[in-house]
């Protein structure tokens, strides 16, 4: 799936980030005009950094 082309995403989807964090989408999306891609806000749901939010290109994450 090409998440970088999606202007919005459902909240609550779980992914494993490229560095191994278990994250969940919040439903917030931001367009990066310089690269013409969308990134999606995720929150760490367990382990180190739990509760922290960051933007992630979900094309590089593993859907769970």
Question: Model-predicted segments: where are they?
Answer:
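Mixed-charge, Lys/Arg-rich low-complexity intrinsically disordered regions
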Residues: 1-15
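A short, compositionally biased
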Residues: 8-11, 34-39
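Short, surface-exposed secondary-structure boundary micro-motifs
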Residues: 18-20, 47
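Short beta-strand-centered aromatic/proline hotspots
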Residues: 20-32
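Short, solvent-exposed loop/turn segments that connect beta-strands within catalytic domains
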Residues: 32-37, 48-50
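SH3/SH3-like beta-barrel fold
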Residues: 42-44
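Intrinsically disordered, low-complexity, charged/polar segments
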Residues: 48-64
């Amino acid at each position: 799936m090409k998440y970088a082309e999606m202007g919005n995403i459902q909240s609550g989807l779980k992914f494993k980030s490229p560095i191994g964090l278990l994250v969940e989408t919040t439903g917030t999306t931001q367009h990066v005009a310089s690269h013409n891609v969308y990134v999606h806000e995720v929150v760490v749901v367990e382990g180190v950094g739990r509760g922290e939010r960051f933007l992630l290109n979900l094309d590089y994450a593993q859907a769970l």
